[in-house]
């Protein structure tokens, strides 16, 4: 605990004693192995976090941010799908408005990304369907839908269920299986598709499609961009498949920071172009 706070063990001990006197409660107790958080500390942690965040946000809101001269690095957790669809516009916007700004895209691991945000190791998450705490802020960006993607010289002009099931499928999945969008619908109809390739990388799929007779369900925004660049064809699925909402998530401590407000405005603009 002392190392995380950049304090000596002696200073940490004195700080804990002062807190114990002030609160009339322990917040850390020593066990046989390590220091352990007490039930009281867990009980007040959310409220204390909110108060500290409000103080930090209030103080930082007075800062001035000039994009044209700023030298800053923003860290965004996002999938390669988001990077490919939004990043194209963001690169152009930053080059014109803020040439000194740098963006670091990090892997989006759903198991750890929220903790990374809380620890201030990233500034923003752009994704869909993540569990939030009370100190997280979410803003919807756009609604996405799925389309079926083939190589352009495929003879199909309309996709029937028979054609859909007959084809070999490529799947984008972050899970260790071959199940994805629409498979629950097929199971209810006692049907299944043949998934021959599962990958966590959205941007690998268009290259695979361009050199095979397979089909893949991809988000429309990404598919439209890849279709132009790689000569692919888009068709509607033969069944209704629920889409998803892409949103950005940040810690509330950054809500009033001018540079963070500017970043979020740029992301919104990038999704609208």
What residue ranges belong to the model's regions?
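A late-sequence structural motif
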Residues: 85-86, 156-161, 233-273
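Beta-alpha-beta core module
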Residues: 133-139, 144, 203-252
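A short LG(V/I)-centered, amphipathic sequence patch enriched
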Residues: 20-39
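Central regulatory/effector-binding core of bacterial HTH transcription factors
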Residues: 70-132, 198-199
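Secondary-structure junction motif
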Residues: 128, 156-159, 167-190, 220, ...
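Interdomain hinge and pocket-entrance segments immediately C-terminal to HTH DNA-binding domains
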Residues: 33, 39, 64-83, 97-101, ...
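Alpha-helical linker/hinge and terminal dimerization helices associated
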Residues: 22-23, 44-66
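Flexible hinge/capping segments at coil-to-helix
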Residues: 133-169, 260
């Amino acid at each position: 605990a002392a190392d995380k706070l950049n304090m000596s063990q002696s200073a940490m001990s004195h700080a804990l004693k002062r807190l114990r006197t002030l609160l009339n409660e322990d917040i850390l107790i020593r066990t046989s192995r390590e220091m352990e958080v007490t039930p009281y500390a867990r009980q007040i942690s959310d409220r204390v976090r909110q108060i500290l965040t409000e103080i930090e946000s209030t103080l930082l809101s007075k800062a001035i941010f000039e994009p044209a001269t700023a030298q800053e690095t923003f860290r965004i957790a996002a999938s390669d799908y988001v990077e490919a669809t939004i990043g194209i516009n963001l690169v152009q916007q930053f080059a014109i408005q803020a040439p000194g700004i740098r963006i670091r895209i990090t892997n989006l691991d759903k198991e750890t990304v929220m903790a990374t945000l809380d620890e201030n190791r990233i500034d923003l998450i752009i994704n869909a369907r993540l569990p939030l705490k009370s100190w997280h802020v979410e803003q919807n960006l756009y609604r996405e839908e799925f389309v079926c993607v083939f190589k352009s010289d495929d003879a199909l002009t309309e996709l029937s269920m028979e054609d859909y099931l007959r084809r070999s499928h490529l799947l984008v999945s972050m899970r260790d299986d071959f199940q994805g969008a629409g498979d629950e619908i097929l199971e209810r109809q006692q049907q299944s598709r043949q998934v021959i390739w599962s990958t966590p990388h959205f941007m690998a799929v268009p290259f695979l499609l361009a050199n095979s007779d397979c089909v893949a369900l991809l988000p429309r925004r990404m598919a439209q961009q890849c279709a132009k660049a790689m000569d692919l064809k888009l068709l509607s699925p033969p069944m209704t498949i629920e889409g998803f909402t892409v949103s950005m998530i940040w810690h509330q401590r950054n809500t009033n920071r001018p540079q963070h407000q500017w970043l979020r405005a740029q992301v919104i603009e990038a999704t609208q172009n």
